[in-house]
Amino acid sequence: FQPTGIANTPGVEKIDAKKMDAQYAADGKLTADFPVYVKSLVMSKNVDDQALGWAFNSFMEGYLKNIKTTTGDYIYRDEMNAGNFLGMPYKVSNQIPTDSKTGCTEMFFGNWADLMIGDQMGLETYTTLDGTWTDENGVQHNAFEENLTGTRALMYDDIGVRHVESFAYVHNIKVI
């Protein structure tokens, strides 16, 4: 079994920023109205609001912090410097990719209490003095012959969305 993640879970609201009306995005470049739309879309599904929040990468954070009014004032910067975005906490993870060719990234909004993470047994480790393995360059190593200790660590985890209506996944957001 391979967890699919929020973005690939059937039923999760998927929003293509490049296909939005100009009020919200212009060819993937978000306007100040877009985050309000995403939050309203999720909240309209009667989602529990106790653990709502945002997740995006550092390019997205920088983009949002730099959105200005027509008079040059930053719209979100002060709030984001305090760790919130539209009144909800956000976290930055650079595991959320930005495509270097298109300059597009992704963002998530939802009730994170509805993202279930299961551990089957914690971390299981094994060590050996006589194991053999092949490294990333194709070179075979033998622990006994090279006076090494081989360690293997296993962790069985699973992740799943409990209520699909609790999340929105936005992709094709132009940030660079």
Q: What do the predicted segments below correspond to?
A:
Residues N46-D48, L52-G53:
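Extended amphipathic alpha-helical segments with heptad-repeat/coiled-coil character used for oligomerization
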Residues L30-D33, A55, F59, E146, ...:
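Generic recognition of stable, solvent-exposed alpha-helical segments in well-folded globular domains
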Residues W54-Y63, Y90:
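Generic detector of multi-pass transmembrane helix bundles and their immediately adjacent loops
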Residues F34-S40, F59-Y63, K68, G83:
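Long, positively charged binding patches that form subdomain-scale interaction surfaces
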Residues K18-Q23, L64-T71:
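Short glycine/threonine-rich loop-to-helix capping motif typified by GTGT followed
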Residues I6-T9, F59-G62, P97-T98:
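Short, catalytically relevant binding-site loops at active-site mouths
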Residues F1-L41, I176:
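Alpha-helical scaffold segments that mediate packing/assembly in large oligomeric complexes
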Residues T70-I176:
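Sequence/fold signature of self-assembling virion shell proteins
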